[in-house]
């Protein structure tokens, strides 16, 4: 099982997450501040990071920025306070893979961890093509990469799964609830805004002008569709 580092200065939240994840079979490391987090990321093999941005000693923002600057691609789930406006663009630029708002349920966190750690988006016997052209980009679902203008970008399993679902239903709207059920694997749906967060990232990769999308189209009141 994956080794998860939980970085959270509120001991009650950190301990509860750690205990529940251990019961699920994960190896868990804990850190209560940003300096300890950076040290553990440097010295221990970590497969997944749960990171609160508001930390003592060194902010979670700095921890994440340094992690990505060093080339690490481990999945990062950010914890944010519900009463704070989530700056999705900032999270994208920092390299976050997903976020949850406090208070959250353990089931929601666990579903996101499993979705981000998924190694493949293809089921046994799936004959879908592994490489597909979308607009002016080439997506390799086997390698989780997107190539555009001679630049190659990494996709998370969630983002690759979202693209695959929209391609399967090309021209038809995919609801936020459908994304969460089929890509995230939720049975009980949380706040659907996390879908919009990932659509924002995909548009920044696929669209020539993300503010005027021509590839991933918003269907108001419903969800999104692939043009």
Predicted features along the sequence, with ranges:
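N-terminal/domain-start alpha-helical segments
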Residues: 1-124
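Short, Lys/Arg-enriched segments at the junction into DNA-binding effector domains
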Residues: 3, 115-173, 177
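Short helix-to-turn junction characteristic of helix-turn-helix DNA-binding domains
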Residues: 41, 166-170, 183
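Short alpha-helical elements of helix-turn-helix
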Residues: 61, 89, 111, 157-160, ...
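Flexible coil/turn residues that form the inter-helical turn or adjacent wing/linker of helix-turn-helix
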Residues: 72, 172, 188
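Hydrophobic residues on short alpha-helical segments
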Residues: 75, 163-164, 180, 200
